[in-house]
C-alpha cells in the first residue's frame, strides 16, 4: 500500500505556506485520516463543545469589513442598537446554559471599546462566569490596559479573527490593518487571556490564501487555543453579497488542515453551518472540528436550531463536552 509522506515542518518549527498547501493537496481520504488521527491524540473524538453567541451591541460599526452586515458603510438594512442591559444579557446566558451550552460568547460591533463600554462588558463577564459558563468576548481592537481589565473580570477567551491571509486581506477590509489585528492579539496574549482567532472561507480568496491564513495562525507562539473556521454567509447589501460559494470539500479540507497544524486547539465549526447538510457537518467533525455554535443565531446570521443539533449529535453517537 502506497503511503504519502507528510510535508516536513522546517527545523525552525514554523509552517511555510507551501507546506500547508501540500496538506490541502493530499487525497481527501488521506487528509481526513491524518486529521482524525491527530484529533484523537488530544481529544475525545465523540465530544463536542457547545458554544452560544450573543450580539450585545448590534450594528453601526465604522469599519468596512466586506462580509459584515453590521458596518454602517453598507446598506444591509440592519439598524444600529445600543449596548444590551446586563439583566437581558444574563437572561440569555441562563437560557443558553439551560439549553446545554458550556461557553457563552458576547460580541459588540465596535472598532474599539470606549472605557465606559468596557466597564459594562467587564461586569457582564463577571456575572456570566458566575453562572458556570466559559466566557468569550469580541469587541474589536483593544488598547493598552484594556485586555488586563477584562482579565481581571475573569474573561477566559478574547476573539479577534485574522479573517484571511495577509496577501488577500486588503480586498476585504481597508479600515483596519492586518498588523492592527496582530497587535490586539498580542495584548490579549500578554494579559494572560486565551486567544480565539480564525478566519472566513469563501470571500474570493485562493487556496494559497487559505493556506497562508492557516500558517499565520499555526505560527503564532503559542497558536490560538480556539480557532473558529467560518463559511461566508453572503448578506444582501454587503460587498460580498454575490461572492461565489466555495466548494464544501474545500471547506472540510480547511478544517482538517487547521486540526493537523494546531493539534491542541478547539477548532470551531462556526458561521455558515446552517447551509450545510447533516452529512457535510459530520465530515467537518470527522476532519477535526470539536466545537459548534449552538442556538438559533450567530450575531446577525442564522444557525441550525437546537433541536436539529441535538438530533445530529444523537445520530452520530456524539455528546456535549463534559465541563
From Swiss-Prot:
Keywords: 2Fe-2S, 4Fe-4S, Biotin biosynthesis, Iron, Iron-sulfur, Metal-binding, S-adenosyl-L-methionine, Transferase
Cofactor: [4Fe-4S] cluster; [2Fe-2S] cluster
Co-factor remark: Binds 1 [4Fe-4S] cluster. The cluster is coordinated with 3 cysteines and an exchangeable S-adenosyl-L-methionine. Binds 1 [2Fe-2S] cluster. The cluster is coordinated with 3 cysteines and 1 arginine.
GO MF entries: 2 iron, 2 sulfur cluster binding; 4 iron, 4 sulfur cluster binding; biotin synthase activity; iron ion binding
SUPFAM superfamilies, A to Z: Radical SAM enzymes
Reaction catalysed by this enzyme: (4R,5S)-dethiobiotin + (sulfur carrier)-SH + 2 reduced [2Fe-2S]-[ferredoxin] + 2 S-adenosyl-L-methionine = (sulfur carrier)-H + biotin + 2 5'-deoxyadenosine + 2 L-methionine + 2 oxidized [2Fe-2S]-[ferredoxin]
Binding locations of [2Fe-2S] cluster: 105, 136, 196, 268
Stretches assigned to the Radical SAM core domain: 46-264
Listed pathway(s): Cofactor biosynthesis; biotin biosynthesis; biotin from 7,8-diaminononanoate: step 2/2
Enzyme Commission (EC) number: 2.8.1.6
CDD domains: Radical_SAM
BP term (GO), one: biotin biosynthetic process
Classification via InterPro entries: Aldolase_TIM (IPR013785), BATS_dom (IPR010722), Biotin_synth/BioAB (IPR002684), Biotin_synthase (IPR024177), Elp3/MiaA/NifB-like_rSAM (IPR006638), rSAM (IPR007197)
Enzyme class: transferase
Residues reported to bind [4Fe-4S] cluster: 61, 65, 68
SMART domains, per database record: BATS, Elp3
Top-level taxon of the source organism: Bacteria
One Pfam match: BATS
Function: Catalyzes the conversion of dethiobiotin (DTB) to biotin by the insertion of a sulfur atom into dethiobiotin via a radical-based mechanism.
Similarity comment text for this entry: Belongs to the radical SAM superfamily. Biotin synthase family.
PANTHER family registered for this protein in UniProt: BIOTIN SYNTHASE, BIOTIN SYNTHASE, MITOCHONDRIAL
Subunit and interaction comment: Homodimer.
Protein name as it appears in the record: Biotin synthase
Source organism of this protein record: Bordetella avium (strain 197N)
